[in-house]
């Protein structure tokens, strides 16, 4: 397919059939707010559009500009992010907002080289912001785009070899103007027509040029990578409750998983356990509440949940500890895993 023809077909289709999403302007003539694209791309990392939409709307209402976000308290940012998962993104979004506001005069970089220097921004996110927010002539490859191109050209490749070939093809097809529309158009074709398991070739604007259109073999592309089986981890979570039925949480100061968030004491499942010195408490009763199961990107977790009822007169809290009422959990930066644990514990009180 000639370079110009592919971009023309996709752009013309997109202008008539784009998905209505809260981070997209309703009018193609309207100037795109880079902050809106910046925020949406952080949220869309490893998360579906359907899941992101309500979180994006709520987040943007509270933090409508990058300056307001940079001035916010990290705890508040993490709290409104709670439930979306992959919490390191929220920490990195906040760090990047601080850098942009304090060091770059509040101006989001419009080039790949400067964007990729910011916390939490890798190759894909930098390219996506450049293309969508600033209409730069860069190649963007997400799962949808990779699937569309692999089927369009019937690429019998997988993994890095596939990505390299897709990049070569797109490099020859990226238009000098309206790359923002071209990129989003390819994404939308993949998301609405050329899906992983459902393919609607009748509706696809590229079907006349697609090498696997209307063929049963289309669903086999892109060729699958054999994934390693997830490892299983086990451990213990401790739910300490006082007479007011408030639950003890720790502020996690460890880097990595659940950084800067409120967590329950635990051991056995992480290298850096969320430890607590139980000797500072007088424990009246102990109950085994059962097992909690939770899936992470690289491992599955099966852990015991232990309820400890405390003697209020013997409680001396450290600075990183706080008692929280179950009905107030949403006011704090508490990951979904711990909401599940509390729900299990409350059944045993």
Predicted feature descriptions by range:
Residues 2-9, 13-202, 206-215, 219, ...:
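Catalytic cores of DNA base-excision repair glycosylases
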């Amino acid at each position: 397919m000639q370079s110009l023809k592919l971009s023309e077909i996709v752009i013309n289709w997109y202008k008539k059939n784009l998905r209505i999403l809260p981070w997209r302007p309703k009018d193609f003539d309207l100037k795109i707010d880079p902050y809106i694209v910046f925020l949406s791309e952080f949220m869309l990392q490893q998360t579906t559009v359907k899941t992101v939409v309500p979180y994006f709307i709520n987040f943007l209402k509270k933090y409508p500009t990058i300056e307001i976000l940079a001035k916010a308290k990290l705890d508040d940012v993490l709290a409104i992010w709670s439930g979306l998962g992959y919490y390191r993104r929220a920490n990195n979004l906040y760090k990047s907002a601080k850098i942009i506001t304090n060091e770059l005069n509040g101006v989001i970089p419009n080039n790949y080289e400067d964007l990729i220097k910011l916390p939490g921004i890798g190759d894909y996110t930098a390219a996506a912001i450049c293309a969508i927010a600033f209409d730069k002539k860069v190649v963007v490859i997400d799962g949808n785009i990779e699937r569309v191109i692999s089927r369009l050209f019937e690429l019998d490749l997988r993994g890095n070899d596939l990505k390299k070939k897709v990049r070569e093809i797109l490099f020859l097809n990226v238009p000098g103007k309206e790359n923002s529309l071209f990129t989003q158009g390819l994404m939308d074709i993949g998301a609405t027509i050329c899906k992983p398991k459902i393919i609607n070739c009748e509706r696809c604007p590229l079907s006349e040029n697609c090498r696997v259109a209307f063929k049963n073999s289309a669903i086999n592309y892109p060729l699958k990578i054999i994934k390693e089986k997830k490892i299983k981890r086990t451990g213990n979570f401790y739910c300490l409750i006082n007479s007011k039925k408030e639950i003890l949480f720790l502020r996690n100061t460890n880097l990595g998983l659940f950084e800067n968030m409120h967590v329950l004491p635990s051991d056995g499942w992480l290298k850096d356990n969320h430890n607590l010195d139980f000797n500072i408490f007088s424990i009246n009763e102990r109950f085994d509440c059962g097992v909690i199961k939770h899936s992470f990107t690289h491992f599955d977790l099966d852990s015991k949940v232990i309820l400890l009822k405390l003697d209020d007169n013997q409680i001396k809290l450290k600075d990183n500890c706080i008692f929280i009422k179950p009905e107030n959990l949403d006011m704090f930066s508490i990951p979904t895993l711990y909401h599940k644990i509390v729900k299990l514990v409350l059944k045993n009180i």
